[in-house]
Amino acid sequence: MNLGIYRQGLRFCQCGYDGSNLRPLGEFTGSGHPSFHHNGRWGITDCYIQECFTAPDRSIPLRLIDLGTNTERALTRVDITTPGLARSYNFRLDPHPVWCDNDNFLIFNAMENGARRVFLADMRKFQ
């Protein structure tokens, strides 16, 4: 999850089911909708359109977080500009990247050719 702990902006955090043992996961800037691999090493997240990760063309990165090496990289940038976004922020598209149950694939939302789509990304090389 993302939390604004230590008054240093959003950070990725982890805690027990009851809220105990709250701790940040590395020094990464938190954003969007994080999801973590069952092996505990890999995280994936998107960002909101108003955050610093958004490009001038309004595409946003899918950020792969490596807790094993304390590094991150953008796997890809996705278009989230919906036809209704100019009228209302409520018409935005959030990618919400998540790991599949078998941890071999990511599922995320994005725009393609003016239409909302659901994508599946093969992540087996990151096992």
Stretches with model-predicted labels:
Residues 1-2, 34-45, 97-105:
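Blade-terminus and WD-like Trp-Asp/Gly-His loop motifs, strongest in beta-propeller folds
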Residues 4-24, 48-80, 104-105, 109-127:
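Beta-propeller blade-edge and WD-like acidic-aromatic loop motif
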Residues 23-37, 70-99:
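Conserved blade-ending motifs and adjacent loop-strand segments that build the rim/top face
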Residues 36, 45-48, 84-86, 121:
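Short, surface-exposed linear patches
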